[in-house]
């Protein structure tokens, strides 16, 4: 399940993050530092050092925005969110096809299962050529290039890549979510049900029927969730 979440950040927030990242200097390091065994050979980009002050400061801005975003909560059903990271592609940089590692270690040593991968775009599409996020899923190959401030949420099990950036600079944040529901198929069903419930409520549909659907939703979540 791929979900496009628009306007996660305001234009003012995007501008602030870009300004801080553009002035980050030595905090930008070789992106291979965080790649796994199979990812490192095909990864050519730069990242903000994972535990640097700028990464924590800007990551907190994103985490606060996620807490206020009902579409993200509905789609990802977050249990734990990995602190957001930041990357930059320019001058032909790319990240070849790979699958994200199954487990990440949080700063406090707790292990996080990567159920959901997230990319938050911080560059406008007309700022760069190339740089599409290409995701292979059960429905084929999806190419993603979103407005600055928009986000794509997709299963971490997906084979994906970032195509070479041939002009300009592509800046983004990326991170992972351990969901309350590890199965993508189950999350997709719950997301569709939640979306339908919201539409029925907005249309003034029969409230008793809506209450019944809400009960079904929460009972399925109770069966499938892991806390």
Swiss-Prot record:
Short name of any one Pfam family annotated for the protein: PKHD_C
EC number per UniProt: 1.14.11.-
Biological process (GO), any one: DNA damage response
Q: Which residues bind Fe cation per the record? A: 98, 100, 160
Matching Gene3D superfamilies: q2cbj1_9rhob like domain, Rabenosyn, Rab binding domain
Cofactors per UniProt?
Fe(2+); L-ascorbate
GO molecular function terms listed in the Swiss-Prot or TrEMBL record:
2-oxoglutarate-dependent dioxygenase activity; iron ion binding; L-ascorbic acid binding
Annotated residues for binding of 2-oxoglutarate: 170
SUPFAM superfamilies in the record? Clavaminate synthase-like
Q: Which UniProt keywords apply?
A: Dioxygenase, Iron, Metal-binding, Oxidoreductase, Vitamin C
Report the SS bond pairs: none
Which residue intervals define the domain Fe2OG dioxygenase in the entry?
80-179
Manner of cofactor binding, per the entry note: Binds 1 Fe(2+) ion per subunit.
**Which HAMAP family does the UniProt entry name for this protein?**
Hydroxyl_YbiX
Q: What is this protein called?
A: PKHD-type hydroxylase BamMC406_5004
Taxonomic classification, please? Bacteria, Pseudomonadati, Pseudomonadota, Betaproteobacteria, Burkholderiales
